[in-house]
Regions:
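Long, largely alpha-helical accessory region at the distal end of helicase-like NTP-driven motors
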Residues: 73, 304, 311-312, 447, ...
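Surface-exposed flexible segments
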Residues: 4, 381-388, 474-483
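Conserved coupling segment at the C-terminus of the helicase ATP-binding
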Residues: 1-333, 467
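Acidic, His- and aromatic-enriched active-site or binding-groove loops in soluble protein domains
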Residues: 329-348, 485-490
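Conserved RecA-like P-loop NTPase helicase motor core
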Residues: 264-283, 339-468
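The structured alpha-helical core of multi-pass membrane proteins
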Residues: 291, 372, 486-489
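Conserved NTP-handling cores and scaffolds of large molecular machines
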Residues: 10-13, 33, 37, 66, ...
Length: 510
């Protein structure tokens, strides 16, 4: 079995075995089930009617929990005990295993959703031909949610030891949700591995270096052998090391086709520190904008900039668009250098944005594309040749370590490491690596959007003081590490700009 794009395999397995349900979905499914029960109550056999009533009770219990949590807690999220979700009237008497068996065998969700859709279509036809008068109320078509709810109920029946339930508020604070998250993909992937004669994980960006690898793989002895240990520790921890082989290849381009800088300071000498506490500084954001102006002046064609999040990108753009007196704002000045485009979190067409960006480059204006790590532009889109003469990464996109979900993930990894015989320090290192590798895998994936063939060339600019630390450098792909400018921390911003100027002049002359 060969799995391509395997940098996604852990997240894919986790996502498949995770599920989220909102209070609004619970209410909608409860209402749909109520309509169905009222219509067919007399046709349902006694046993079926009992099971349907049990589903109603279970939905009421989950909805009541969310409503109580919404009213009595200010927390954005927290871990939830399974028992707390099953305290509704009569719920303790429900055999969840029998109920789930009934739902699967009877296909109740499909029947309810089919009836609701059919009833709505029939009502529309009656109104259109004048058989009944519209009631004046604007009703939205029912969304088939009971099948989704059934999936959540299945996790209540048999939650995995490595899974957790969470309560969370929606981003707009208009809804509350229950989440079930798989924290560790090992056991689910093991089922796949044991059915195969051999398994190959292949990918272009699979190498955040795990310092924790020494716990299990010191026998490998070479740096490249340890590069993929993050995957090994989380997918093959049950296998002896002699059954595992790793191979890390270099890039197809010659060394002279890449210049990579960890950029520590901006043009004014202000240190680039895009940690969560510091990155909101107006001075820092202005320094970033002025730095981009200088870079865009010497980098030809297309420049792609990746920000840690949509929220931070919005904040930066808002600051750059502020005007002081009659002087031009940073946003306008950037627009004079290159046509500026930005990725939107909304369902705006990626194709349209890319087409406009490409067109601006073809016309000689050049393009500056502001994107987000982990967003629509960071994977599956190739910025080859003129589309990506520079990739700039602003800061490090660490996930929120204070979130209940990440606390649970780290705690689980630390405990699993200890259970396998790891020392307390090794357990802590495993949790830290999980957190750092999640960040660096996203960074490496974004960097990999440029330089797509042997004759391609580009610059990689990593804007943050932390990119000069050995821990972070070792989590970059080998071909990037080899291209990093030495002693970059000691070099002024002007030296970096001069290096870029010389690099692109040399390439354009060949």
């Amino acid at each position: 079995m060969i799995i391509d794009e395997a940098h996604n395999v852990m997240d894919a397995i986790t996502s498949i075995h995770s599920i989220t349900i909102s209070l609004s979905q619970l209410k909608r499914s409860r209402a749909q089930l109520g309509v169905y029960l009222q219509k067919f109550r007399n046709r349902l056999k006694g046993k079926n009617r009992v099971y349907v009533t049990q589903v109603v009770r279970l939905l009421d219990s989950l909805a009541a929990y969310l409503q109580n949590k919404e009213a009595n807690t200010k927390q954005g999220e927290c871990i939830v005990k399974t028992a707390d979700l099953l305290v509704g009237k009569g719920v303790d008497q429900i055999n969840l295993y029998k109920l789930m068996h009934y739902l699967e065998e009877s296909k109740l969700a499909r029947k309810v959703e089919g009836y609701i859709i059919d009833a709505e279509e029939r009502e529309k036809k009656e109104v259109s031909v004048g058989l009944r008068q519209p009631d004046g109320k604007k009703t939205e078509p029912s969304v088939p949610v009971l099948t989704h709810v059934q999936g959540f109920l299945a996790t209540l029946t048999d939650p995995a030891p490595e899974g957790r339930f969470f309560f969370e508020r929606s981003e707009d604070d208009k809804d509350v949700r229950l989440k079930y998250r798989l924290l560790d993909p090992t056991h689910h992937f093991q089922e796949i591995v044991e059915d195969a004669r051999a398994v190959i994980l292949a990918g272009g960006t699979m190498s955040p270096v795990s310092l924790y690898s020494k716990l299990r793989f010191s026998c490998y002895g070479t740096h490249h052998d340890r590069q993929m240990s993050d995957y090994v520790n989380r997918l093959f921890s049950y296998l002896p090391s002699e059954r595992l082989t790793t191979l890390s290849c270099g890039h197809v381009i010659p060394a002279g086709n890449l210049v990579a800088w960890p950029v520590m300071k901006g043009p004014s000498g202000i240190e680039y520190d895009f940690t969560f506490d510091q990155r909101k500084s107006s001075t820092m954001v202005d320094e970033l904008g002025i730095g981009l102006l200088s870079m865009c002046h010497v980098i030809p064609d297309g420049v792609v900039v990746f920000f840690p999040s949509y929220a931070y990108l919005d904040q930066v753009v808002q600051r750059w668009q502020m005007r002081t007196g009659t002087s031009k704002c940073i946003w306008d000045r950037l627009g004079e250098k290159k046509a500026v485009f930005r990725e939107s979190k909304e369902n705006a067409s990626v194709e349209d944005t890319l087409q406009q960006y490409s067109s601006a480059i073809d016309k000689g204006k050049g393009g500056l594309l502001l994107s987000v790590v982990g967003g629509k532009m960071s994977e599956g889109i190739n910025f080859s040749d003129r589309l990506g003469r520079a990739v700039i990464v602003v800061g490090l996109p660490y996930p929120n370590i204070h979130s209940s979900e990440w606390k649970a993930k780290i705690e689980h990894v630390e405990k699993s490491t200890a259970d396998r015989g790891g020392s307390p320090s090794e357990s802590k290192a495993a949790g830290r690596d999980l957190y750092e590798n999640s960040c660096m895998r996203a960074v490496n994936q974004s960097i990999g959007r440029a330089i797509r063939h042997q004759n391609d060339y580009a610059s990689i600019l990593l804007l943050d003081r932390r990119y000069d630390t050995e821990r972070i450098k070792r989590k970059l792909p080998g071909w990037i590490r080899q291209g990093l400018v030495q002693d970059a921390a000691r070099q002024p911003f002007t030296e970096m700009v001069g290096s870029l100027t010389a690099f692109f002049r040399a390439k354009e002359a060949t």
